[in-house]
Amino acid sequence: WYRGKFTDYKSVSVKEMKQVKHFLHVEWGGDSHARRHAEDPFKSLGGIPAGVGADERAGDFSLVGGDARASRDGDWSESYIVKLVDWHLKEQETMTWLTGTAYWPFKDFSTPLRPENPVPYVNQKGVIERDFAKKEVFYVFQSYWTQKPMIHIYGHTWPTRWGAANEPKEILVYSNCPAVELFVNGVSQGIKQRNSQDFPAAGLHWKC
């Protein structure tokens, strides 16, 4: 979120893991405006280099100055953060040496330390809002960790998509079910098998 591309997560973690006896990854995540969505959340992130590390440096939290980074240049959309979290969880599934992780934080909260944020004095890294309304990223975690069967189509607060006429749109479904069939206007778009290593949405993604 503050430096590098999230797709470098595992390679960076492996490098750091080799320097310690036990590896616990805490305080990971990123901000997202509830109800802000994007057809291409990566559009403004082309200037961020890959493979150069992910260490946080002084001033990285600021919205001005410094190197290209998602926290400064991104759109803070729910569309971006679900993919960041999905990628981390996908990778953690195969990181058997990982002692544990702690996402930061559970809920958006007020803070005097963020007067410059787009919503002043609010840290928006939570998976739920301050009134406990669930953000989209809540369902990403649920699809990996809950035992009770669940299913959620991304974008319940995004009723109107945009783009060219008849342009195919990405549909993401978060579920812990072994297989999911998607219907659009009563027509089946096919059955897909859940596979945590098939990014995004553990293979439950369609273009239609």
Feature map (PLM): residue ranges:
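Substrate-binding/catalytic cleft of secreted carbohydrate-active enzymes
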Residues: 1-133, 137, 141, 148-162, ...
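Long, low-complexity serine/threonine/glycine- and acidic-rich segments characteristic of extracellular
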Residues: 151, 180-208
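Short proline/glycine-enriched turn/loop motifs at strand-loop junctions of beta-rich domains
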Residues: 174-179
